[in-house]
Amino acid sequence: MNFHRKLAMKCTRTEIIGCGHYLPAKVLTNDDLSKMVDTNDEWISTRTGIRSRHVVAEGELTSDMAMHAVEMAMQNAGVTAADLDLVVVATLTPDNTTPSVAARISGRLGVKVGTPAFDIGAACSGFVYAMTMVDNMIRLGQIKTAAVIGVESLSKVTDWTDRNTCVLFGDGAGAVIVRAAEGEGTANDTGVLATKVYADGTQYENLYTTGGISATQTPGYIRMNGKEVFKFAVGAMCEACNNVLEQAGVSADKVDWLLPHQANIRIISSVGQKLDIPTEKVIVTVDHHGNTSAASIPLALSESVENGRIKKGDLVLIPAMGAGFTWGGLLVRF
């Protein structure tokens, strides 16, 4: 699903011109969870790297979090709703079965009538999938400016009696504003340099929710075969990274930051080690966000830009893997 070329010729790039994020006010620590299930802080942090996560307040919707994140991104980008040609939301926890969260966001923002808006359901890979779609649309000349949002209310599909899964997940939102820009067709360009997405539907039952509209008419709860997910995730994310690096003609030692989907510290660390990227170049936010699925990458990205870690000109390698199985990678220069 990519049309990138290695030839050095002028081309249209997709630049990230603004980032935003939002975390609900309520924080759930490992000590809090130890009062709910048979676990403790040491057990959770040692195995996952997670110490706390945020959860939505009563009545706080997925679209509410998305609004906070996209408004921050728009402000940082210096754009208004009138500038947007597209709104895309990656989520597995929408407000309603239909319409999409993206449509709801468009209406609340006051985006001009007729502007396309849609959701993407690729679980933890959702943001990478969304950016791939948007990058293709920008390079084909169909749009110029877009809002891309990753947002999840995973607390709504978490079984709080299952200690194997309830320790992992959190709620939150991240957003980016992207805009078409002219590039020279080299790896020194600013913007998306390469993308690649994948899926393997034979892995369906290793990570899924027990509910669904046609199956049970309920949201259900997340169920996961942790050993299989870990084994698959590390290899898949490395595969995606190597693919986008090869597309762009860049070696891993030129990467300034590895920003993986924040699943757990073991997966994050293993991917970094296999790619031979030093620990100090690996961005980790899972310790205070937990696994926020489609929100994790844009959330970590926005936080890292805000705190000054990611700077202008930095080359950022972004892999993800999620239910489906789905996986993919982005290579972006800021």
Residue ranges of each PLM-predicted region?
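Short acidic capping loops at alpha-helix termini that bridge into adjacent secondary structure
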Residues: 42, 80-86, 113-116, 144-145, ...
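Conserved catalytic cysteine-centered active-site region
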Residues: 45-64, 92-146, 273-300
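Acidic, glycine-rich active-site loops and adjacent beta-strand->loop/helix elements
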Residues: 22, 90-95, 122-127, 150-155, ...
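Flexible, glycine-rich active-site loops centered on histidine and acidic residues
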Residues: 139-172
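Catalytic phosphate/nucleotide-handling subdomain of diverse soluble enzymes
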Residues: 299-319, 327-334
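Condensing-enzyme catalytic core mediating Claisen C-C bond formation in acyl metabolism
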Residues: 2-58, 162-231, 235, 239, ...
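Buried hydrophobic positions in well-ordered alpha/beta secondary-structure cores of metabolic enzymes
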Residues: 16-18, 44, 73, 84-87, ...
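Phosphate/pyrophosphate-binding loops at sites that engage ATP/ADP/AMP, CoA/4′-phosphopantetheine
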Residues: 69-85, 239-256, 304, 308-309
